[in-house]
């Protein structure tokens, strides 16, 4: 079945259609209907514009290409499974939640509270402007993500990020089993209370990073403006260049070309030791 060049505004306009192509349609109009594609299966959606709320709910097996979801298209994808979005624009708040097996490729996203409670989310070559993204999501792979947002990746588990630029704050709090390769992470208070965070060839920018962490590993990373780093953390870090200051690390080893100040004061945890090495040239 093919639905082409239609303007639809009814409630559940194409409810539960299966094995269909939806091409060049606009979901907008005075009826202001919600949930246009709810419960659809095996659909291909191409070149459509979504201006109404909740279009993709409980959808299974969809390919969505060159579509626009405007600012008024709130909560666009919830409770979905196995959807691939390519060259799409997502502009409404809470655009992705409680979904599984989602792929986003070359998408532009402006959405607060994006990507909550998702499982197996893959993003490649995407731009994301957001606040509070990826809360409690797991099993994610992100490559070439350009992100601007606050409070990102909190409580996430089993995440791999590559070649990305993350401009954020309070990122990776309470995260578990996250690895980041070849990326820039900018923002204060990075990864407090994280567990098994590994940063490889990354540049870290911002005050008071990586505190209260367990199993923290940094390999061949750079640190810029990172004062009061590693407080109460179990850390194994090899830093290229200097660290502005290190305060009361709990255990492990920190190796750098220079450290502006090492603060070991009366608040240091007793009966613990972290080896701090300044490499000579």
Where are the language model's segments positioned?
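Long, distal/terminal scaffolding or interaction modules
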Residues: 1-281
């Amino acid at each position: 079945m093919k639905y082409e060049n239609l303007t639809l505004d009814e409630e559940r306009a194409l409810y539960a259609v299966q094995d269909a192509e939806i091409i060049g349609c606009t979901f907008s109009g005075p009826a202001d209907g919600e949930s246009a594609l709810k419960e659809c299966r095996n659909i291909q959606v191409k070149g459509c514009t979504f201006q109404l709320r909740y279009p993709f709910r409980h959808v299974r097996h969809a390919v969505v290409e060159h579509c626009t979801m405007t600012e008024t298209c709130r909560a666009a994808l919830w409770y979905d499974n196995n959807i691939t979005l390519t060259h799409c624009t997502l502009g409404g708040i809470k655009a992705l939640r409680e979904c599984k097996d989602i792929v986003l490729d070359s998408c532009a996203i402006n959405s607060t509270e994006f990507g909550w409670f998702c499982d197996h989310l893959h993003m490649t070559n995407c731009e994301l402007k957001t606040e509070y993204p990826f809360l409690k999501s797991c099993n994610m792979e992100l490559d070439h993500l350009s992100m601007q947002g606050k409070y990102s990746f909190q409580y996430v588990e089993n995440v791999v990020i590559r070649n990305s630029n993350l401009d954020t704050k309070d990122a990776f709090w309470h995260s578990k089993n996250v690895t980041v390769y070849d990326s820039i992470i900018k923002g204060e208070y990075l990864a407090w209370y994280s567990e098994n965070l590994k940063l490889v060839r990354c540049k870290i920018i911002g005050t008071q990073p990586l505190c209260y962490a367990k199993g923290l590993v940094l390999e061949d990373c750079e640190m810029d403006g990172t004062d009061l780093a590693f407080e109460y953390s179990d850390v194994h870090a090899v830093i290229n260049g200097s660290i502005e200051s290190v305060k009361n690390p709990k255990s492990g080893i920190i190796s750098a070309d220079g450290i502006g100040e090492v603060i070991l004061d009366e608040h240091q945890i007793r009966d613990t030791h972290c080896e701090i090495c300044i490499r000579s040239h």
